[in-house]
UniProtKB/Swiss-Prot annotation:
The gene is fruB. NCBIfam families: PRK11109.1, PTS_HPr_family. The PTS EIIA type-2 domain is phosphorylated by phospho-HPr on a histidyl residue. Then, it transfers the phosphoryl group to the PTS EIIB type-2 domain. In contrast to classical PTS systems, the fructose-specific PTS has no requirement for HPr; FruB combines a IIA domain with a HPr domain. Residues 2-142 form the PTS EIIA type-2 domain. It comes from Salmonella typhimurium (strain LT2 / SGSC1412 / ATCC 700720). PROSITE patterns: PTS_EIIA_TYPE_2, PTS_EIIA_TYPE_2_HIS, PTS_HPR_DOM, PTS_HPR_HIS, PTS_HPR_SER. This is Multiphosphoryl transfer protein.
Length: 376
């Protein structure tokens, strides 16, 4: 985990334009002993190649591979510009994080930062923060409320089971491992009978022991009988705030529209999408899967190429890292795409809904095959 010092954070700065802002940041990196004087040329050259604007008012200026020899030690300098700095194409940066890193050390840092900054509320707080301490707490995720835990780690699919107790125990264990519940919750949800929602779907929860909002799902390989009723899938909810309500609403919509059977046959990524994305409930969604071959995965430059390809089309497009959390992200947001933590060899599933969905998926596949600007 990268550690950020308050000495590396500069609140309330001003710059007339992007170049001036980058020169200020480069000077701070040099002053801190992170880079030699020539690194600024690489930072400016990088902007000519691809804008380092991530979205949500955040930019991450950094050098090119040609100036890696100018890096003395890995580090960052964070500049806050409350009045904003135009970063091109109508984009305004309020926080610029200058990165100095040799080899590929910056990729882990970038993924860490984008995971925090992809939260829209955090980005807004970064604009209005007034002290280095407050900015540091936001960037390190110390002030970030915990997001709903519902991903591959809280799902157990294709379980050999002939009773609900097996599914109850699996879900309780998953939630306990995630730090979402305590022993009282585990005991309650294992001992009490779940509620039958119909169509093979069952639900349980507990008023006690909720430490963090999370949802666990377990599914039997084959449906079984519980007192004359079909049982195949159990959803267990830990509720510490209102976040699980949206999941329960989507579950309710599936049941009302007699589409809950999708949950019984879907793979992990599709099941997550059904419970977390409204688009997944429609019938006119197309999907395609591609493998990322870029040596360093989807960092800022190939990520930008991917997002720019997606923005050429009108369809709503989401992307899911099948080898990551499995949760879908908005394909038009560079911040959210980079936060997926895509590495070489990871499988991405794209879903598209709209009049040009088929063309969009083909263009995405072609762009990935061509190396997203880094060569095939």
């Amino acid at each position: 985990m990268f550690q950020l010092s308050v000495q590396d954070i500069h609140p309330g700065e001003q710059a007339g334009n992007k170049e001036e802002a980058i020169r200020q940041i480069a000077a701070a990196l040099a002053q801190a002993g992170n880079v030699a004087g020539g690194y600024v040329d690489g930072m400016l050259a990088r902007e000519q190649q691809t804008s380092t604007f991530l979205g949500n008012g955040i930019a991450i200026p950094h050098g090119t591979t040609d100036t890696r020899d100018q890096v003395l030690k890995t580090g960052v300098q964070v500049f806050q510009f409350p009045q904003g700095v135009t970063w091109g194409e109508g984009q305004v940066a309020y926080v610029a994080i200058g990165i100095a890193a040799s080899s590929d050390e910056h990729l882990g840092l970038l993924r860490q930062l984008t995971h925090v900054l992809s939260d829209d509320s955090v980005a807004e707080q970064l604009k209005s923060a007034t002290t280095a301490e407050e900015l540091r707490a936001l960037l390190m995720g110390e002030k970030q409320s915990e997001q709903l835990k519902l991903d591959n780690e809280t799902m157990t699919l294709d379980v050999i089971a002939s009773s609900l107790v097996t599914l109850q125990a699996l879900n309780a264990a998953r939630l306990k491992e995630a730090g979402a519940v305590d022993a009282a919750f585990v005991a309650k949800t294992i001992n009490d009978s779940p509620m039958n929602l119909g169509q093979g779907i069952w639900l349980n929860d507990s008023a006690e022991g909720n430490l963090r909002s999370a949802v666990a799902v377990s599914r039997a390989t084959q449906a079984f009988d519980v007192e004359g009723e079909k049982a195949a899938l159990l959803v267990t909810v830990a509720m510490n705030d209102e976040q699980p309500i949206a999941v329960l609403k989507r579950l309710g919509d599936l049941l009302l529209n007699n589409k809950a059977d999708r949950l019984l046959s879907a793979d992990a990524a599709t099941l997550l999408a059904l419970l977390t994305s409204d688009d997944a409930l429609t019938d006119d969604v197309l999907s395609a899967e591609f493998v990322v071959r870029n040596e360093h995965g989807l960092h800022a430059r190939p990520g930008t190429m991917l997002v720019n390809t997606i923005k050429q089309f009108n369809s709503e497009i989401t992307v899911t890292n099948l080898d990551g959390t499995g949760k879908p992200a908005n394909g038009r947001s560079l911040m959210k795409v980079v936060a997926l933590g895509v590495k070489k060899g990871h499988r991405l599933r794209f879903t598209a809904q709209g009049e040009d969905a088929e063309q969009a998926l083909k263009a995405i596949g072609d762009a990935i095959a061509a190396g997203l600007g880094e060569g095939a």
